[in-house]
């Protein structure tokens, strides 16, 4: 009798879990060709759509493999996902209504995948993937083959970065500004970049959906990190870096700051 009760309770829990979970109306999208799975890879995705009116709210759920930055009309609105594993893949829910406008609107995302030599804390696959899905809103921005994708050539791994012994962090990266599609978030990049139709990858599904595996989706359980501009201080000194040389700049902050620098260069 006890065995029957246990089996019935287990069956009931599994049935409830499967009923609550579902396959999403958007799909994971990716590139048509990527570099070796051992390398850092970057791709740019975007989709533009016309809106006759601006809604009071427009909730979307967004995730990527491994990481993403999401822009609406050139404004950064989300960064993620939170650390995940394939059985518990996080997504963020974002209200993009404050960034929309009447007329043409562009959603854009840069997605990067660390490849086989990713940091130990970064789980996932070796394939770039992006997911955007409306949460009760107009599905016009749901990811599918109607999105555009551009394979990035500006970023590469620091393969000559060697640490003796065990090393669990990222290798670091190189950035070549000559190959970067400046203005891509709002379709204002220079001509000549080879944008392609995005490739549909896998169906997107909640954790607990029957007969599904890989990137099982769960809502983010921790808040987004605070991100705001802070001044580096009033420093106005000339600095000349001769060609083919290196220099170092130390900025001493009075408080702990995880800094993402904005550099303005010319030439």
State the predicted function of each range.
Residues 49-52, 56-71, 107-109, 195:
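Aromatic-lined ligand-binding clefts that engage carbohydrates, nucleic acids, or primary amines
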Residues 22-35, 110-230, 234:
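An acidic-aromatic loop/edge-strand motif
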Residues 1-6:
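Positively charged n-region of N-terminal signal peptides that target proteins for export
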């Amino acid at each position: 009798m006890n065995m029957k009760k246990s089996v019935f309770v287990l069956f009931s829990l599994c049935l409830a879990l499967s009923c609550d979970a579902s396959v999403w109306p958007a799909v994971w999208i990716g590139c048509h060709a990527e570099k070796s799975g051992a390398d850092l890879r970057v791709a740019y995705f975007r989709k533009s759509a016309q809106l006759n009116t601006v809604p009071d709210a427009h909730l979307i759920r967004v995730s990527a493999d491994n990481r993403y930055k999401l822009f609406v009309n050139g404004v950064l609105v989300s960064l993620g996902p939170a650390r995940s594993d394939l059985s518990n893949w996080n997504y963020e829910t974002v209200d993009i209504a404050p960034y929309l406008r009447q007329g043409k609107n562009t959603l854009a995302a840069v997605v990067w995948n660390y490849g086989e030599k990713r940091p130990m804390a970064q789980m996932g696959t070796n394939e770039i993937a992006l997911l955007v899905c409306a949460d009760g809103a107009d599905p016009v921005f749901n990811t599918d083959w109607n999105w555009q994708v551009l394979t990035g050539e500006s970023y590469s791994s620091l393969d000559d970065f060697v640490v003796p012994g065990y090393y669990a962090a990222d290798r670091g990266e190189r950035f070549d500004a000559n190959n970067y599609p400046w203005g891509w978030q709002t379709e204002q990049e220079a001509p000549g970049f080879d944008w392609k139709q995005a490739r549909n990858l896998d169906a997107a599904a909640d954790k607990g959906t029957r007969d599904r595996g890989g990137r099982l989706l769960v809502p983010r359980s921790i808040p987004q990190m605070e991100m705001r501009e802070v001044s580096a201080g009033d420093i106005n000194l000339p600095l000349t870096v001769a060609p083919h040389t290196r220099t170092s700049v130390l900025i001493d902050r009075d408080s702990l700051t995880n800094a993402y620098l904005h550099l303005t260069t010319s030439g």
